[in-house]
């Protein structure tokens, strides 16, 4: 894991699980606990792909979520292949309780990134983002699983990041107010030919 130029960085250990009843009791389009709710179902994922179904919900949140009415995206529990990297934007809560996402073997993309790949935004452009839950399985690939840059008020909680090779499980830089809560980082492999910085952990 790597962190550079982050203000108010906090790592917290908790033991209580996140409540999941809201996911199953709240229909799509309802407002619950201050969030507009979107449910990504197994049938949607089966008819397209995990990437297409989840990213469609995140794109809807990008277009419509506000600080006054943020969006919460629930993904049905299950094990899914992630064929492309997800993008998440401001005022969005992504709930992945009971979800395992596995990157395609030999692929080259971040599993999830704040903002777009060609972003030129600076400062704390993206705000109020939560990634809650999920097993993020890098499947032995060598690209960072989660990348978080130029954000304010972001939380990563109840997640497991694992199984990357010669790379970071997570990179964070240029942020203000990050909470990492009840997360596990595991199975990061380093080959003898890899450069040392691919295995470092820096917080500063």
Model-derived segments and their meaning:
Residues 68, 101-103, 109-138, 146:
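N-terminal adaptor/linker regions at the entrance to substrate-recognition repeat cores
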Residues 93, 97-100, 124-138, 152-163, ...:
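Right-handed parallel beta-helix
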Residues 9-56:
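Right-handed parallel beta-helix/beta-solenoid
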Residues 1-4:
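Sec-dependent signal peptide cleavage junction
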Residues 45-51, 67-109, 136, 141, ...:
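N-terminal extracellular ligand-recognition/capping segment immediately after the signal peptide
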Residues 54-66, 81-91, 104, 119-124, ...:
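Short, T/G/N/S-enriched strand-turn elements that build extracellular solenoid repeat scaffolds
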């Amino acid at each position: 894991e790597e962190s550079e130029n982050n203000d108010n960085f906090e790592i917290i250990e908790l033991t209580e699980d996140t409540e999941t009843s809201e996911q199953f009791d709240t229909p799509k389009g309802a407002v619950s606990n201050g969030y507009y709710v979107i449910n990504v179902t197994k049938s949607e994922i089966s008819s397209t792909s995990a990437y297409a179904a989840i990213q469609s919900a995140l794109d809807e949140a990008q277009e419509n979520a506000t600080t006054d009415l943020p969006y919460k995206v629930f993904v049905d529990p299950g094990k899914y292949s992630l064929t492309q990297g997800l993008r998440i934007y401001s005022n969005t809560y992504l709930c992945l309780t009971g979800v395992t996402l596995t990157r395609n073997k030999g692929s080259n993309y971040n599993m999830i990134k704040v903002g777009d790949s060609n972003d030129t935004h600076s400062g704390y452009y993206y705000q109020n983002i939560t990634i809650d839950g999920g097993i993020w399985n890098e499947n032995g690939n060598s690209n960072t699983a989660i990348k978080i840059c130029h954000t304010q008020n972001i939380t990563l909680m109840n997640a497991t990041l694992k199984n990357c090779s010669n790379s970071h499980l997570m990179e964070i830089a240029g942020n203000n107010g990050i909470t990492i809560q009840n997360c596990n980082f595991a199975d990061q492999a380093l080959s003898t030919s890899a450069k040392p910085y691919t295995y470092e952990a820096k917080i500063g």
